């Protein structure tokens, strides 16, 4: 089970939180489509800003968006010009008041989405898939990861038959629900077709906190 399922989905409600936080009645489908539009717009516009995740919260006619990024300066812009332009665009897109929070990711080598994206960009620049994966693993382990696993699949090196190759170091306990495992994917567009990149990073155990009764 833990080997196949998305590690984040398996842990939501246990040690992971939802990325969309709102309740809805009959307009649920409309709000869900609006969420998808917001995410697609931000991912396209901020494609070079190392965006890891986007959280969306709703209250009445207001949308609060939290962007987790490794390059906050690119998102904010000079004097906040870029984030203000972003807010106006999202206001027009949704027809609602939008508030944007920027959260900086301190350790980019321990963020699976950013690591996967980095490997994908290297593959597009014709760097060997083995070298790209091994360098990512070394950086993550130096950065304090307990374990990491990477996989690249597709026509590796322009081979006629597609295959998958993975490398790992340390431990990645996918069945342990209290294990803080970050999972990220990315795609690389090469001259031979698309290559898929998957990354699992084990950052240690998250112990449940005692609540006052």
UniProtKB/Swiss-Prot annotation:
Q: Give GO cellular component annotations, separated by semicolons.
A: cytosolic small ribosomal subunit
**Which UniProt keywords are given for this protein, alphabetically ordered?**
Ribonucleoprotein, Ribosomal protein, RNA-binding, rRNA-binding
Q: Name one Pfam family in it.
A: Ribosomal_S3_C
- Give any single GO term for biological process: translation
Tell me where in this chain the KH type-2 domain is found: 38-106
Query: Which GO molecular function terms does the record list?
Result: mRNA binding; rRNA binding; structural constituent of ribosome
Is Protease there in the keyword field?
no
Family to which this protein belongs: Belongs to the universal ribosomal protein uS3 family.
Q: What does this protein do?
A: Binds the lower part of the 30S subunit head. Binds mRNA in the 70S ribosome, positioning it for translation.
HAMAP family of this UniProt entry? Ribosomal_uS3_B
Q: How does it assemble?
A: Part of the 30S ribosomal subunit. Forms a tight complex with proteins S10 and S14.
Name the PANTHER family for this protein. 30S/40S RIBOSOMAL PROTEIN S3, SMALL RIBOSOMAL SUBUNIT PROTEIN US3C
Listed name of the protein: Small ribosomal subunit protein uS3
UniProt lineage: Bacteria, Bacillati, Bacillota, Bacilli, Bacillales
Q: Which gene encodes it?
A: rpsC
């Amino acid at each position: 089970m833990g080997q196949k399922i998305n590690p984040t989905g398996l842990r939501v409600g246990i040690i992971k939180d939802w990325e969309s936080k709102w309740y809805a009645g009959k307009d649920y489908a409309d709000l869900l489509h609006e969420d998808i539009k917001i995410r697609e717009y931000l991912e396209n516009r901020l494609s070079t800003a190392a965006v890891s995740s986007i959280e969306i919260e709703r209250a009445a006619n207001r949308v609060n968006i939290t962007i987790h990024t490794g390059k906050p300066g690119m998102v904010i812009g000079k004097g906040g010009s870029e984030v203000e332009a972003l807010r106006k665009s999202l206001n027009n897109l949704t027809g609602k008041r939008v508030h944007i929070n920027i959260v900086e990711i301190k350790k980019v080598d321990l963020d699976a989405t950013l690591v996967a994206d980095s490997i994908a960009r290297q593959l597009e620049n014709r760097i060997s898939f083995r070298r790209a994966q091994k360098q990512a693993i070394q950086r993550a382990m130096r950065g304090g990861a307990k374990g990491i696993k990477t996989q690249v699949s597709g026509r590796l090196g322009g081979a006629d038959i597609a295959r998958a190759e993975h490398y790992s170091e340390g431990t990645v306990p996918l069945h342990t629900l209290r294990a803080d495992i970050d999972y990220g994917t990315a795609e690389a567009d090469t001259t031979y077709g698309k290559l898929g990149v998957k990354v699992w990073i084990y950052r240690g155990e998250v112990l449940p906190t005692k609540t006052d009764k």
